[in-house]
Amino acid sequence: MTLLGTALRPAATRVMLLGSGELGKEVAIECQRLGVEVIAVDRYADAPAMHVAHRSHVINMLDGDALRRVVELEKPHYIVPEIEAIATDMLIQLEEEGLNVVPCARATKLTMNREGIRRLAAEELQLPTSTYRFADSESLFREAVAAIGYPCIVKPVMSSSGKGQTFIRSAEQLAQAWEYAQQGGRAGAGRVIVEGVVKFDFEITLLTVSAVDGVHFCAPVGHRQEDGDYCESWQPQQMSPLALERAQEIARKVVLALGGYGLFGVELFVCGDEVIFSEVSPRPHDTGMVTLISQDLSEFALHVRAFLGLPVGGIRQYGPAASAVILPQLTSQNVTFDNVQNAVGADLQIRLFGKPEIDGSRRLGVALATAESVVDAIERAKHAAGQVKVQG
């Protein structure tokens, strides 16, 4: 039996978000729908989820002592990480002391860096992956590239949204790629993964929910990336029944091995009927923002339902749908959005995240569309995103 209290009352059910970006904002909204008290934490003030939380705190989430202090102050029933850059050893301690880390502290620690999850997938679960080597110095990095061969990809073991990632075609790129990887790591300079390039037809995110009533799958989400950042996503991605079966089998093994209740974003390469594991996030995925318009329960609603111990039942997908990011480039601490009236309409929506500032290129919103086909939905979403004029 799940007992939920009322926010701001003595018996409130309290959820603490560690990371308060646009994904955390949607999780906070879903918590609010159930009367759950929300505490938003991030490294900067006025982050998107803080706008819709009951309270907020600004801390360095890589500082275990600071993390413990805010947890002891707020006494949350659920700690919900939204990002990788968190003091995961402290999360493990807090979980051992009885706190509920979503989906569990082990999953957060393993997926905090690419090494933990790659070794779990390839070496423990024996799942198909790309070839890979790890390196923690430039000389070992060069040896790893020589072993893997060209082309290959280098990534910091801990980063997100493509930061520090380079597609390497020749030896002339090595020095610059190493330096960029050292700058792009979420916890500073350090270890990298060098991966062989996988030949694939397309990539998918298989949003997978581990809940009290079993494992559930959303329809596969296709996506297009530039420099490691997602530009558009769509649902459903067409694939063969055998490939879908294999994708679900891989995703099921991964989420059950990680443990805990919640939604996981399982990234996979698909080539014909073959499926290769890429990465997993133990939380809602940015490409899954399409589910805000494509499903009866968005990935955020599913995450909240699962970690609160509620059954999922089933997931209804409405048909072809797409998302396209609003990704301006400017510098401002007073951003405005013009021409919004031309970005919305029948079966056409936008979300503006409310980020307090921009310095360069930053994702500030997303357009969402449905249509008779996925191709048309993508075009509608891209057109809508292009209509929004960002100024500052």
Swiss-Prot record:
GO terms for molecular function: ATP binding; magnesium ion binding; phosphoribosylglycinamide formyltransferase 2 activity; phosphoribosylglycinamide formyltransferase activity. It catalyses: N(1)-(5-phospho-beta-D-ribosyl)glycinamide + formate + ATP = N(2)-formyl-N(1)-(5-phospho-beta-D-ribosyl)glycinamide + ADP + phosphate + H(+). This is Formate-dependent phosphoribosylglycinamide formyltransferase. Its EC number is 6.3.1.21. PANTHER family: FORMATE-DEPENDENT PHOSPHORIBOSYLGLYCINAMIDE FORMYLTRANSFERASE. Mg(2+) binds at residues 267, 279. N(1)-(5-phospho-beta-D-ribosyl)glycinamide binds at residues 22-23, 82, 286, 355, 362-363. Involved in the de novo purine biosynthesis. Catalyzes the transfer of formate to 5-phospho-ribosyl-glycinamide (GAR), producing 5-phospho-ribosyl-N-formylglycinamide (FGAR). Formate is provided by PurU via hydrolysis of 10-formyl-tetrahydrofolate. Keywords: ATP-binding, Ligase, Magnesium, Metal-binding, Nucleotide-binding, Purine biosynthesis. One of its GO terms (biological process) is 'de novo' IMP biosynthetic process. It comes from Escherichia coli O157:H7. GO terms for cellular component: cytosol. The keyword Nucleotide-binding applies. ATP binds at residues 114, 155, 160-165, 195-198, 203. Pathway: Purine metabolism; IMP biosynthesis via de novo pathway; N(2)-formyl-N(1)-(5-phospho-D-ribosyl)glycinamide from N(1)-(5-phospho-D-ribosyl)glycinamide (formate route): step 1/1. Belongs to the PurK/PurT family. Residues 119-308 form the ATP-grasp domain. Homodimer. Signal peptide: none annotated. It is an enzyme of class 6 (ligase). It comes from the Bacteria.
